[in-house]
């Protein structure tokens, strides 16, 4: 399966925005497999970040993970204040404590404008963005998390497999 839609300026991009290698992760902030993949991806980006364009798209599996969608909204609200990746990392690093209170605590620790953050997490536009990511995942053949795409093609493997293949090339 191929990635739909293609990566654009509207995505959350880390690393080299002009890199020849693009990795897209569809993730769920409460998924334990995504949580386990997070430090592997961080290490990969520390080593190869100048050669990779890494994109994260929300794929909250809300029926199994009740805090996945609120966490996605919190990350999107933080993005409006220029702190998407900081919120993203903090959520995964505290995944075992995930709660509504934790999301507010992280926002405070990131020194976000709290009235704006609290308003933004309820904004229909952010709900639409999270839903749009989810729908794009469905169109792209995502059926679990994490799911990775390498240069637009679905990668059948986990984060460790991805790093191993990148290390070989």
PLM features per residue range, with description:
Residues 3, 11, 62-63, 70, ...:
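Generic detector of short alpha-helix boundary/capping microenvironments
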Residues 13-14, 98, 155:
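Short clusters of hydrophobic/aromatic residues that line enzyme substrate/ligand-binding pockets
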Residues 24-25, 29-108, 167:
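Structural alpha/beta surface segment adjacent to cysteine/selenocysteine redox centers
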Residues 4-21:
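A short beta-strand-turn-helix
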Residues 10, 18, 58-62, 74, ...:
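A general structural-boundary detector
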Residues 3, 20, 26, 33-45, ...:
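C-terminal cap of thioredoxin/glutaredoxin-like
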């Amino acid at each position: 399966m191929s990635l739909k839609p293609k990566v654009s300026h509207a995505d959350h991009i880390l690393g080299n925005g002009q890199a020849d290698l693009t990795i897209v992760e569809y993730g769920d902030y409460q998924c334990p497999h995504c949580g386990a993949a997070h430090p592997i991806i961080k290490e990969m980006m520390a080593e190869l970040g100048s050669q990779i364009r890494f994109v994260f798209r929300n794929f909250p599996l809300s029926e199994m993970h009740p805090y996945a969608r609120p966490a996605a909204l919190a990350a999107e609200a933080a993005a409006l204040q220029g702190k998407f990746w900081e919120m993203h990392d903090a959520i995964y690093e505290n995944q075992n404590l995930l709660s509504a209170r934790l999301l507010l605590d992280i926002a405070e620790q990131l020194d976000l404008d709290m009235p704006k953050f609290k308003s933004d997490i309820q904004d229909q536009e952010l709900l639409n963005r999270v839903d749009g990511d989810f729908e794009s995942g469905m169109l792209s053949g995502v059926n679990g998390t994490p799911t990775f795409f390498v240069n637009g093609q679905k990668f059948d493997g986990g984060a460790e497999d991805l790093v191993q293949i990148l290390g070989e090339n």
